[in-house]
Amino acid sequence: MALHQFDYIFAIAMLFAFLDAFNIGANDVANSFASSISSRSLKYWQAMVLAGLCEFLGAVLAGARVSGTIKNNIIDSSIFTNDPAVLMLTMTSALIGSSCWLTFATAIGMPVSTTHSIVGGTIGAGIAAGGANGVVWGWSGVSQIIASWFIAPILAGAIAAIVFSISRFSVLEVKSLERSIKNALLLVGVLVFATFSILTMLIVWKGSPNLHLDDLSETETAVSIVLTGAIASIVYFIFFYPFYRRKVLDQDWTLKLIDIFRGPSFYFKSTDDIPPMPEGHQLTIDYYEGRRNLGTTVSVEDEENKAASNSNDSVKNKEDIQEVDLVRTETEPETKLSTKQYWWSLLKQGPKKWPLLFWLVISHGWTQDVIHAQVNDRDMLSGDLKGMYERSKFYDNRVEYIYSVLQAITAATMSFAHGANDVANATGPLSAVYVIWKTNTIGAKSEVPVWVLAYGGVALVIGCWTYGYNIIKNLGNKMILQSPSRGFSIELAVAITTVMATQLGIPTSTTQIAVGGIVAVGLCNKDLKSVNWRMVAWCYSGWFLTLPIAGLIAGIINGIILNAPRFGVEYQMT
């Protein structure tokens, strides 16, 4: 049985929930992977594969608790007890208001809080339905959420600054490069333990409803968290530590990534058989490529390494340009057309060209060179990038290489946490609509169906794959100088903060948390000009506008529908 007379409301809610989740992926994916991509720890397509997997699993495995908060704690559902269909309409209006604003903000490249958006939409629609008293303003509802918007960025910034400062003084700015590398290899082992413990904590702590872990005792929960971190750290020291020690410290340039599985043998293998490195060979990529040439920088690398690195960069850049040109000649005409003009020309050529057009549209997002766009696409938000980079230190690429491995892990952890936390912004209202449509009752604390979480997770992944680049361009190197060591500190801080918020049932803004971490790491240079405050102001202006605009859209739509004239109703003159 179901309220089939309101099938159209359920259908509309499904559509706008998908649009909302799509824009969550397109807008908020920058929080998870902007640092990894901007620091060159991950290629864009690698980040998108990792994002797709971790965001979806986070949404399905651990997303229910926060979804319940969005659905139950913002609006006082008791006022809808006798009219559950009105709550169904109210939640749909909230989705419409949120998704419309997110679509506009994402299109103009404004990183906004998707949490602000759905909370604003829910508040606006709730006021239109039941007045101001229909909203839970107390600490158990809106007040707690609003407080978290201020507390979370400060907390993330403090954690990021502490983590990066530890890396600076124990690894990055140690005078001896050999000692710096040794310290980095040991520190990473500790950080692997911390990172995997945090991820396990997200799934197990207080019991994830969808995994039925609520009955675990405190002792069992603590043991599972510590044991997972310990196993991950042991695996690191067995396989990864000897591999990276031989590759980076002993400079064995012949090693490939697959040689990690030979890690234990490197503990006993002599370094005498390592062949001399060919002249001009790069042991690692230059993680600062494209940003060194903007101005004179404060560097801890010696001049010989810098010269060799720059020489290798020029060769690599030529190869990259040739590869890009080869790809373009296969899919683009000789005449210089904009992307949209070329797509339009393919559309007009008929159905034979449509498969190619479909592929170009789908792959457009993950084929973007976002680092080039961050550095070279100048606009009023870019500010003085040259001056900002001049005030930042460029650390040795071999040390950064070690951090790049760890950054991929923290990015995955943060992505999992992001999927768990932010999918609620779309699935919470949709779950309420579905339960009412199916049962014609409100239900005090109904469980969010797994299919709703999966539906939101799929939309979120599609959004980050196809349109996430538009937001990533505005973060990363446009806000501070990014590198693996900096990005790792940011991502670990954001993951910790998001994990805490998710398990406490507080839907925080991962956008604000991420920016808080980015700004704090930038300020570790002890220079205010090492942060692009224009971009920070752009982010904050988006957060300031989001809640009222989303609320206004949702409130107007819900108010018009609820108070619209109807057949068979007699209206009195007043």
Curated annotation (Swiss-Prot):
Region described as Disordered: 301-332
Extracellular side: 1-5, 65-84, 139-145, 206-222, 376-398, 469-503, 563-574
Family matches, as InterPro entries: Phos_transporter
Record's bilayer topology term: Multi-pass membrane protein
pH-activity relationship: Optimum pH is 9.5.
Keywords: Cell membrane, Membrane, Phosphate transport, Symport, Transmembrane, Transmembrane helix, Transport
UniProt name for this protein: Phosphate permease PHO89
